[in-house]
Every structure is written in C-alpha cells, then in structure tokens.
C-alpha cells in the first residue's frame, strides 16, 4: 500500500491507497512539527484505522510548506524505513507545463492536474481548489498545463478582516442563506462566501474564453471548502481526493 501526504498551508492531508482505491483519509495541523511528532502521528493514525504501518510499501509527499519537508522526510525514514518520493521540480508528471518558470507551479496544483487528466482524459479542464488559497488551473485536452489564477481562500479572507481591523470578529466559514447580513458576523460571512463565489464565476468565464477559446470544458472542484459551493452550479464534479490521487499517480510514474 502507498501512503500519500499533501502538506498544505493549514493542514497535512493524507490517505492510504491499496492499488487505486483509497482506504483511509486523515488531517493534521501543518504547523511545524518535529520528525518524531510527525512519525508518531502517522503510525498512530494508521493503527487507529486498522491499517498496520508494516503494510506501507511506499510513501509519496506533495508539499507547499518547505519548513515541514525535512521533518516529514526524516519521520518517514525513521518510523517506516522508507525514503519517500517528493513531488517536486524535475520529476515526471506527464504534463507540458507552460508557466514561464515551471518551477514556480505549486506541487499541489501539479498533483491536481495529473489526477484530473488521468481521470478525465482528452478534455479541457479547469480545476478549482478551495483551500487556504483558492486556485484555478487550466489544463488542455493535450495535457498542457496552461496556467491559472490564485486568490485568497475563504478562511484567509475572513481572517484578514479580523486581524487587520479593530472591531470585526473572527467568524465561522459557512454558506449563508441570505446575501444581506443582519449582523456583523452574518455580513462578514455573506461577503466572504458570495465574494469568492462571484470571483469564481468571473474567473471561470474569463479562463474559458482566454485559455480555451470558448471550447467545451470540464470543471472540477476539490479542497476543504469545495462542498460549500455544491449547489451553486460552479463545477461539474466534486473530487475531494484529487490531490491525493495525483500524488499517487506521480509516485507510480517516478518509482519502481
């Protein structure tokens, strides 16, 4: 079995695959932890889900938080006796990356694109990842990674208001029933949710026109906040494990 780990700005998200089937999922705060803390956590979460650590034959990591990388890699070697595969610049992806500097593309965005083109071949695809940042990736039917857009995510937008103003509070991120808030909290929740929704609609329209000349596209959504937009007609498919699937596929491309 293969343990796939996505190190994001807010959480470490992981899963265990048996072949192409995911057997378990877990989350952990990605605030910097020692290698021992990470190793103990990983072994514990596996055992709690009736997955013996000894069944893990391969570990693959995708990270956008460099300060966690060394500790996590050390944990894999010390606690699993496995040198993990790291999805990074220079590895095989199966994509033609059109960024001016391909090294700049986040590993999580590459993982999403790998999984998207594998699951939905020969299609023009927009992937929206609703995480700490909300990211858009445009991938052509020929597996060209064309680029995309990045904007603050819902949590980041709400936190910016509470941290940079004197009287605006921190709020829970929810889909409000009314766009017209009747309290400060409701107004922030509405502004954050419908502001991101509106931005997404505009970006989809513009990317569709600019990247794909209005040709048929498929829109995929993933990330921790994606389900909040499930009834808004933004996307064709919600794929919660897209990044983990991409990490697994990248590892299979690059390791024996």
Curated annotation (Swiss-Prot):
Transmembrane helix in keyword set: no
Biological process, per Gene Ontology: coenzyme A biosynthetic process
Entry binding sites for substrate: 99, 106-109, 184
Gene Ontology CC annotation, any one: cytoplasm
CDD domains in the cross-refs: ASKHA_NBD_PanK-III
Binding positions for ATP per the UniProt entry: 6-13, 132
Reactions listed under catalytic activity: (R)-pantothenate + ATP = (R)-4'-phosphopantothenate + ADP + H(+)
Superkingdom, taxonomy of origin: Bacteria
Free-text remark on how the cofactor is bound: A monovalent cation. Ammonium or potassium.
Pathway annotation from the record: Cofactor biosynthesis; coenzyme A biosynthesis; CoA from (R)-pantothenate: step 1/5
UniProt keyword annotation of Protein biosynthesis present: no
Keywords attached to this entry: ATP-binding, Coenzyme A biosynthesis, Cytoplasm, Kinase, Metal-binding, Nucleotide-binding, Potassium, Transferase
Residues the entry annotates as binding K(+): 129
Molecular function (Gene Ontology), one example: ATP binding
Residue positions of the active site: 108
The family this protein is said to belong to: Belongs to the type III pantothenate kinase family.
Assembly and interaction partners: Homodimer.
Protein name per Swiss-Prot or TrEMBL: Type III pantothenate kinase
Organism taxonomic ancestry: Bacteria, Pseudomonadati, Pseudomonadota, Gammaproteobacteria, Legionellales
Gene name in the database record: coaX
